[in-house]
Amino acid sequence: MRTSGEKLRSILQQAARLIYLKGFDGTSMQDIADACGMTKAGLYHHIATKEAMLLAIMHYGMDLFEERVMGPVKDIADPLARLKATLANNVRLVTLDSTKEVTIILHEHSTLTGDAKAEINARKKQYVQFLERSFEEAMAKGQIRKVDATLAAFSFLGTVLWTYKWYRSDGALSPEQLADGIGDLFFNGLMP
């Protein structure tokens, strides 16, 4: 028998799958209830509103970022090595592990309102600040040239996170090759 936490996780996984495929506005609570094999009333027993469900999915996605991207690199003292490991972990997360949740964070962030939006934005800001600090440390050590740390952080994120739009696991590059290639372009540039 499932615990209530396991049941909620199962509901959120089904909801994430549907929202990933149909978008938040295109997914009804009835769709989610049907996918979970329950009534809509039963679904509302676990989740109060559709926005609360979206918020829970986004929190789960941010938990994954913190656990799989930032967690393993936070104790790497060398800032350039930390940035390169962050890039590899982020590419892995986007391409292999949790594409649905990451896509939902990227596509549906403007759907949230009020406190829910502020909660997710605060968590996203922590990641940006982590990157900014890492770029600033790498500049201070002379590992990279002087650039605007905020511009570097958002360029990093744009480059890495956009891969979910075009990368295909059955394509020419493995996730590791993709991370190496993006890292080479990002940290070494295009010039010979």
Regions found by a protein language model. Give the residues of each.
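Amphipathic alpha-helical packing segments from all-alpha helical-bundle domains
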Residues: 63-70, 104, 114-140, 150-154
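Hydrophobic/aromatic residues within well-ordered alpha-helical segments
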Residues: 50, 57, 61, 65, ...
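C-terminal peripheral helix-coil segments that are non-catalytic and often amphipathic
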Residues: 85, 89-96, 129-140, 159, ...
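Helix-turn-helix
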Residues: 10, 14, 18-52, 56
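Short helix-capping/turn signature of helix-turn-helix
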Residues: 47, 106-112
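Hydrophobic alpha-helical connector segments
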Residues: 56, 70-98, 152-156
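N-terminal intrinsically disordered/low-complexity leader segments
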Residues: 1-6
